Amino acid sequence: KECTGVLLTVDATYGAIKEAENKGCNLIISHHPIIFTPRKSFLTKDYKCDVIASAYVSGTAIYAAHTNIDGLHDNMAVRTLKAIGAKNVTTLFDNGFGAQGDVDMKFSEIKEKVKKLLCDDTIFTVGDENKKIKKIAMINGAGGDDECFSRAREVGADLYISGEFKHHILLEAKETNYALMSVGHYASEMCFNDVLNDILKCHFDTIKIVKYYEGNPFNG
């Protein structure tokens, strides 16, 4: 079946499927897979099955690019740190995940730059916002776990940014006066659309590409 256009989105939702129909795109490339755990049946009446059924009825294929995109050398975290002015940006892990970069800014200045970049005021911080930051580490999405937090400290980052954090990580950061910034899972991965757009344009210069932004699931 010939591809009539590609819609890029963080999540393949009802809204994304409808937008793909309206814009004449019969392929959706999302970052998050609809199905994370194996299923024996798609006949169950639940949200995930309904979304898949909606795509099927509309003739829309869905492809999820998740871990392979997170591990790119020019991944979402790398792009985010470069966009806020970090220098010497490299990946945080040897396998390509996350990013680290050098800065010379106050914590509060970085916060304002991130808010402007992500167009989202719902950013939460831990630590003294007057603190001078020399090195940032970042992992988009759910990077606020023990392994990622430990890696950020290991490379000498004095600010770690992610989409969401485990409570005990937030508590440890507060108790040790370590700077954290939680920007929201969705907001931290919005640049997925730009990453995929650039990849597709390199290989298919005439393909129609539509970027779809569902928005943060949280109110306010």
What is each PLM-predicted segment?
Residues K1-G220:
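Active-site catalytic microenvironments in core metabolic enzymes, especially phosphate/sugar-handling
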